[in-house]
From Swiss-Prot:
Ranges where the record places region Disordered: 1-27, 98-126, 165-250
Domain CSD, chain residue ranges per copy: 29-102
Binding site for Zn(2+) 2: 151, 154, 159, 164
Subcellular location: Nucleus, Nucleolus
GO function term, MF aspect, one: zinc ion binding
Name of the protein described by the UniProt record: Protein lin-28 homolog B
Role: Suppressor of specific microRNA (miRNA) biogenesis. Binds target primary miRNA transcripts and sequester them in the nucleolus, away from the microprocessor complex, hence preventing their processing into mature miRNA. The specific interaction with target pri-miRNAs occurs via an 5'-GGAG-3' motif in the pre-miRNA terminal loop.
Compositionally biased spans, kind Polar residues: 168-177
InterPro entries the UniProt entry points to: CSD, CSP_DNA-bd, Lin-28_RNA-binding, Lin-28A-like_Znf-CCHC_2, NA-bd_OB-fold, Znf_CCHC, Znf_CCHC_sf
Biased composition (Low complexity): 200-209
Residues reported in the UniProt entry to bind Zn(2+) 1: 129, 132, 137, 142
GO cellular component: cytoplasm; nucleolus; nucleus
Alphabetized CDD domains for the sequence: CSP_CDS
Length: 250
């Protein structure tokens, strides 16, 4: 029983006593300037020139993260910027806990910004802003408030591009030209069959003497000659017509 009580009251092997806890590393106060700072990664190093008010023989580097900077907006440090800070010693080295400007003022910060977070201007490629009509940006980048809708072709607010009269006028000559080319030319045989009443043309008038003269030469009567002219191909009247007119003039 005594042994059991002693084992219970004694300390377990492998455990540190409660009074032997690790003490936190103490904080020191230092001053110096920013050695370098990467604005994209958000960290850098401070060159400490004095500690607890006493100058150091050689500068000591202290790690600094952007989360430890006392300032508003985008947190960063400018190279050579004077700072005051509190720091501690860790397994990785000296790390800053809080960084301010001289006298506890906010840090100034660097003017540089990460390239990935800045809004890059779009190069004009012929595109047009649908809001204001500008060529150097798109509608989502337009600084003006939403403008009234207007035609993208002539920039008029009276109609949309689907009903633009200027666009239809520019396309009309090409369509009308194709329509005229597609229309077939009327043949001379149609003029003869219709009696010359179409398009203001009239069929050539032959006198009775001319008809009899033609029928005598061909050996047919005037009625047969006239019927043969109507049943002939379209090319025959065009060849015979001028020859008959020349005979009449002579």
């Amino acid at each position: 029983m005594a042994e059991a009580g002693a084992s219970k009251g004694g300390e377990e092997p492998g455990r540190l006593p409660e009074h032997e806890e690790e003490e936190e590393s103490p904080l020191w106060h230092g001053a110096g300037h920013c050695k370098w700072f990467n604005v994209r990664m958000g960290f850098g190093f401070i060159s400490m020139s004095s500690r607890e008010g006493s100058p150091l023989e050689s500068p000591v580097d202290v790690f600094v993260h952007q989360s430890k900077l006392y300032m508003e907006g985008f947190r960063s440090l400018k190279e050579g910027e004077p700072v005051e800070f509190t720091y501690k010693k860790s397994s990785k080295g000296l790390e800053s806990i809080r960084v301010t400007g001289p006298g506890g003022s906010p840090c100034l910060g660097s003017e540089r910004r990460p390239k990935g977070k800045t809004v890059q201007k779009r190069k004009p490629k012929g595109d047009r802003c649908y809001n204001c009509g500008g060529l150097d940006h798109h509608a989502k980048e337009c600084s003006l408030p939403p403008q009234p809708k207007k035609c993208h072709y002539c920039q008029s607010i009276m109609h949309m591009v689907a009903n633009c009269p200027h666009k239809t006028v520019s396309q009309q000559p090409t369509s009308s030209q194709g329509r005229h080319e597609a229309e077939p030319q009327p043949s001379t045989s149609a003029f003869l069959r219709e009696g010359g009443g179409t398009y203001g043309y009239s069929s050539p008038s032959y006198s009775q003497e001319g008809r009899s003269e033609i029928s005598e030469r061909s050996g047919r009567s005037p009625q047969e000659a006239s019927s043969s002219k109507l049943s002939a191909s379209p090319e025959e009247p065009s060849r015979k017509g001028p020859s008959v007119q020349k005979r009449k003039k002579t």
